[in-house]
Regions:
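A short, N-terminal "cap"/entry segment at the start of jelly-roll beta-barrel domains
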Residues: 1-28, 35-43
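Short connector loops at helix/strand junctions that flank enzyme active sites
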Residues: 19-23, 43-47, 53-55, 93, ...
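Short alpha-helix capping/helix-loop boundary micro-motifs
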Residues: 46, 82-87, 109-110
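Glycine- and acidic-residue-biased ligand/ion/polar-headgroup-sensing regions
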Residues: 46-48, 52-60, 66-67, 75-79
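A short hydrophobic beta-strand segment most commonly corresponding to one strand
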Residues: 50, 97-99, 115-128
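Non-DNA-binding regulatory cores of transcription-related proteins
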Residues: 72-86
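Conserved metal-binding segment of the jelly-roll/cupin
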Residues: 91-111
């Protein structure tokens, strides 16, 4: 949170920006939200995700991975693909954040209210 408060993240270029080596870095992403059927579910084992909305509105669908079909973990990408349905969701607008723990399956880039829009977001990756 200190880093986010001390840096103008909106001015950061897309891509990965190191903060403390592999222990802590931030990925800046920009994309257009879409229908949920166009998106995928994921979870992570090695990092927490802290999603901080910089511009726009995005729905993130959520479910615990224990409620989902877990596919083969891709260790080099810290990527656990999952399949299932949401049991809840959050809508992030500018300044909002969401922390996803290893047991939290999440599907990002969902169009809130069915309305597609461009967003810019910082995703802090925090090694656990």
């Amino acid at each position: 949170f200190d880093y986010a408060g001390e840096h103008d993240l909106k001015s950061f270029e897309k891509g990965s920006h190191p903060i403390d080596g592999d222990r802590l870095f931030v990925n800046i992403v920009e994309y257009e939200t879409t229908a949920p059927e166009n998106r995928f579910w994921e979870a992570h084992r090695q990092y927490l995700d802290l999603h901080l909305m910089l511009d726009g509105t995005e729905q993130i669908d959520l479910n615990f991975i224990d409620n989902m079909v877990q596919k083969e973990f891709v260790e080099k990408d810290d990527f656990l693909p999952c399949e299932g349905e949401p049991n809840s969701h959050v809508v992030l607008t500018e300044g909002d954040f969401l922390i996803c723990y290893p047991r939290d399956g999440h599907r990002t880039a969902v169009a809130a209210g069915g309305k597609s829009r461009m967003i810019k977001k910082a995703i802090f990756k925090i090694q656990i």
